[in-house]
């Protein structure tokens, strides 16, 4: 049996930074309440650990409950400008761990919106990152996530297009081709983060060589879902799992080359647990 781990699997820079800062804030032992706006990352184990240590999750519709001096961690997905201003007015201590790649998209959108450009965001309209980015152009962006949606856009005098940072490269390129015919002047920025791109490329390459492919990450994680889609094209035995205990003997039976990749919100220890589980089950297989 051979277990192969894709390069660039697991925590990305932005997520790692967010987690480190959350634990640093916990260790400060301040007399103020500590919250994260939504789950800090799409990983149930990490969220549970933080909650057990005293970090509360608060949703946007509950923010009125916050008191002056409360600490609020803005997760790596970022938030809208309006929400930022609201929190400042309330006297909340904002701990902003917005991923620098996402911050870059926000800055581009704000700059070009002020210059009078229509903004087009290529991505999932329900994803927190996209919702936050849209908030830097007064929620007036056109959001498209397919070639068909792009074809239905109006014709723009001048437009600026950006991508959700976790998009699949080909998806962005296909939609961009349509956008080029939709504006007299189109300024566009491929804002897919290079860590996402490298992770996807590595998963694509590895899934072509293996009998079974495990994609580890939260079931609601956008970047993990995209990894699963990429791997499924190359390996029919692709499984999206959150935890090692989801792996069964049947998944591995008769297969010798096992591949593993992991989403940006997956800690190293979860990857290690998956490796140990595979070794344990394959040991049983060999003993039969």
UniProtKB/Swiss-Prot annotation:
Cofactor binding note of this UniProt entry: Binds 1 [4Fe-4S] cluster per subunit.
Gene: ispH
Pathway it works in: Isoprenoid biosynthesis; dimethylallyl diphosphate biosynthesis; dimethylallyl diphosphate from (2E)-4-hydroxy-3-methylbutenyl diphosphate: step 1/1; Isoprenoid biosynthesis; isopentenyl diphosphate biosynthesis via DXP pathway; isopentenyl diphosphate from 1-deoxy-D-xylulose 5-phosphate: step 6/6
Cross-referenced PANTHER family: 4-HYDROXY-3-METHYLBUT-2-ENYL DIPHOSPHATE REDUCTASE
Gene Ontology biological process terms from the UniProt entry: dimethylallyl diphosphate biosynthetic process; isopentenyl diphosphate biosynthetic process, methylerythritol 4-phosphate pathway; terpenoid biosynthetic process
UniProt keywords, alphabetically: 4Fe-4S, Iron, Iron-sulfur, Isoprene biosynthesis, Metal-binding, Oxidoreductase
GO molecular function: 4 iron, 4 sulfur cluster binding; 4-hydroxy-3-methylbut-2-enyl diphosphate reductase activity; metal ion binding
Family per record: Belongs to the IspH family.
Catalytic activity entry: isopentenyl diphosphate + 2 oxidized [2Fe-2S]-[ferredoxin] + H2O = (2E)-4-hydroxy-3-methylbut-2-enyl diphosphate + 2 reduced [2Fe-2S]-[ferredoxin] + 2 H(+); dimethylallyl diphosphate + 2 oxidized [2Fe-2S]-[ferredoxin] + H2O = (2E)-4-hydroxy-3-methylbut-2-enyl diphosphate + 2 reduced [2Fe-2S]-[ferredoxin] + 2 H(+)
Binding site for [4Fe-4S] cluster: 12, 99, 193
Species whose genome carries this gene: Caldanaerobacter subterraneus subsp. tengcongensis (strain DSM 15242 / JCM 11007 / NBRC 100824 / MB4)
Function recorded in the entry: Catalyzes the conversion of 1-hydroxy-2-methyl-2-(E)-butenyl 4-diphosphate (HMBPP) into a mixture of isopentenyl diphosphate (IPP) and dimethylallyl diphosphate (DMAPP). Acts in the terminal step of the DOXP/MEP pathway for isoprenoid precursor biosynthesis.
Entries under InterPro entries matching the protein: LytB/IspH (IPR003451)
Residues engaged in binding dimethylallyl diphosphate: 42, 77, 127, 221-223, 265
Binding site for (2E)-4-hydroxy-3-methylbut-2-enyl diphosphate: 42, 77, 127, 165, 221-223, 265
CDD domains cross-referenced by the UniProt entry: lytB_ispH
Active site (catalytic residues): 129 (proton donor)
Names of required cofactors: [4Fe-4S] cluster
Entry binding sites for isopentenyl diphosphate: 42, 77, 127, 221-223, 265
Domain of life: Bacteria
Protein's name according to its UniProt entry: 4-hydroxy-3-methylbut-2-enyl diphosphate reductase
Enzyme class: oxidoreductase
Iron among keywords: yes
């Amino acid at each position: 049996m051979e277990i192969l781990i894709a390069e660039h699997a697991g925590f990305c820079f932005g997520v790692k930074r967010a987690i480190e800062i959350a634990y640093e804030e916990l260790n400060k032992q301040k007399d103020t309440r500590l919250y994260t706006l939504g789950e800090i990352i799409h990983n149930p184990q990490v969220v549970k650990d933080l909650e057990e240590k005293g970090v509360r999750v608060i949703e946007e519709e509950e923010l009125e409950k916050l008191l002056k001096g409360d600490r609020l961690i803005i997760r790596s997905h970022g938030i809208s400008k309006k929400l930022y201003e609201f929190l400042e007015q309330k006297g909340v201590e904002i701990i902003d761990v917005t991923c620098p790649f996402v911050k870059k998209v926000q800055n581009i959108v704000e700059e070009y919106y002020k210059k009078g450009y229509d903004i087009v965001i290529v991505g999932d309209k329900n994803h927190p990152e996209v919702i936050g980015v849209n908030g830097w152009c007064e929620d007036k962006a056109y959001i498209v996530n397919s070639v068909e949606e792009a074809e239905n856009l109006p014709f723009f005098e001048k437009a600026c297009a950006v991508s959700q940072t976790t998009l699949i490269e080909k998806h962005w390129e296909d939609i961009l081709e349509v956008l080029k015919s939709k504006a007299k002047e189109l300024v566009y920025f491929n804002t897919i983060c290079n860590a996402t791109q490298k992770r996807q490329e590595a998963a694509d390459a590895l899934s072509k060589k293996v009998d079974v492919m495990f994609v580890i990450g939260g079931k609601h994680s956008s970047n993990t879902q995209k990894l699963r889609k990429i791997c499924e094209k190359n390996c029919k035995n692709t499984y999206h799992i959150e935890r090692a205990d989801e792996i069964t003997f049947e998944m591995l039976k008769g297969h010798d080359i096992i591949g593993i990749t992991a989403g940006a919100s997956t800690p190293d220890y979860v990857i290690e647990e998956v490796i140990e589980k595979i070794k344990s089950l394959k040991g049983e297989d060999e003993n039969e």
